[in-house]
Amino acid sequence: MACLEIPQQPQLVCQKATPSDPAGCDGGPGGPTEGDLECLVCREPYSGVRPPKLLGCQHAFCAVCLKLLLCVQDDAWSIPCPLCRKVTAVPGGLVCTLRDQEKVLERLARPGLEVPLRPQGLANPATLTAGQPREAGEEEQDAVTTNRAAARRLAAHLLLLVLLIILILPFIYPGVIRWVLSFLETLALLLALLFCSHPGQQDGCMPTPRTLFCRERKPSEIASIS
C-alpha cells in the first residue's frame, strides 16, 4: 500500500510554530486557543470521536484524518505529516497508540461557561403569579365539566336501557310490567332531581345568577384576550 501524495500545506496555518519549537501551536503557557481546538486537515473540532493525536514532529491532527493518512513505507506503517512531511512510525498501524495532545484534551474536559436560557424567566413575574390562580380555576372548571358530561352520558345510557326494558317486558311478564314501570318512573324522577334541580351546580338545567354572570362575562374575556 503506497502512501498517498498529500499536497504541501503552507506553514502559515499556525504562526506560533517554529523549527526550534514545533509545539508552539499548543497555545503556549496560556493554553490552546480557539483555532487550536480543530483539526488542521478537516477543520472539524476535536471531540471524543476525533481526539487530537501528536505525530513525531509534534504536530497534532484528529485521529480520523490520521487513519486516512496511514500508509506502508519500508514494510512498516507510517504517517507523513501534512505540514512538515516528516514521517512518523505507527506500530501495528494503530493510530490509538499515538500520544494525545494533553493541553487540548484538558481544554475539552473543562465545561464552558454557558448561561442557561429560561424563556419563562423573561416574562413578568407579576403576570405569572396572577396567571397561576386563573389556570388552577380553569383546570378545576374543566374537571367539573368533564364529570358532568360523564354523568349525563351515564344517565342517557340508563334511559336507553329503560326504554328497552319497557319494550321487552310486556311480551315476557305481562303482570309485572306495572311494578317495573313504577320503579322506572321513580328512577327517572330521581335522575331529574339530581341533574336538573340542584341549585349548587353550575351546569344544571336551571341557571343560577352566578352562572348567568359567568356566561355574560366570557365574551368580554375572549375579546380582551384577542
Swiss-Prot record:
Zinc fingers (RING-type) by residue: 39-85
Domain comment, as recorded: The RING-type domain is required for ubiquitination.
Region (Disordered): 121-143
PTM annotation: Polyubiquitinated. 'Lys-29' autoubiquitination leads to proteasomal degradation.
Protein's name according to its UniProt entry: E3 ubiquitin-protein ligase RNF186
Reaction equations catalysed: S-ubiquitinyl-[E2 ubiquitin-conjugating enzyme]-L-cysteine + [acceptor protein]-L-lysine = [E2 ubiquitin-conjugating enzyme]-L-cysteine + N(6)-ubiquitinyl-[acceptor protein]-L-lysine
Major subcellular site: endoplasmic reticulum
Keyword terms of this UniProt record: Endoplasmic reticulum, Membrane, Metal-binding, Transferase, Transmembrane, Transmembrane helix, Ubl conjugation, Zinc, Zinc-finger
Coiled coil residues, start to end: none
Gene Ontology, cellular component aspect: endoplasmic reticulum membrane
Record InterPro entries: RING_finger_E3_ubiq-ligases, Znf_RING, Znf_RING/FYVE/PHD, Znf_RING_CS
Species name: Bos taurus
Pfam annotation, one family: zf-RING_5
Gene Ontology MF terms in the entry: ubiquitin protein ligase activity; ubiquitin-protein transferase activity; zinc ion binding
Family matches, as SUPFAM superfamilies: RING/U-box
Pathway: Protein modification; protein ubiquitination
Biological role stated in the UniProt entry: E3 ubiquitin protein ligase that is part of an apoptotic signaling pathway activated by endoplasmic reticulum stress. Stimulates the expression of proteins specific of the unfolded protein response (UPR), ubiquitinates BNIP1 and regulates its localization to the mitochondrion and induces calcium release from the endoplasmic reticulum that ultimately leads to cell apoptosis. Plays a role in the maintenance of intestinal homeostasis and clearance of enteric pathogens.
Lineage, broadest ranks: Eukaryota, Metazoa, Chordata, Craniata, Vertebrata
Top-level taxon: Eukaryota
EC numbers for this chain: 2.3.2.27
Record's subcellular location: Endoplasmic reticulum membrane
Quaternary assembly: Interacts with BNIP1.
Gene3D superfamilies (alphabetical): Zinc/RING finger domain, C3HC4 (zinc finger)
Any single biological process term in GO: protein autoubiquitination
Membrane protein topology class: Multi-pass membrane protein
Transmembrane residue ranges: 157-177, 179-199
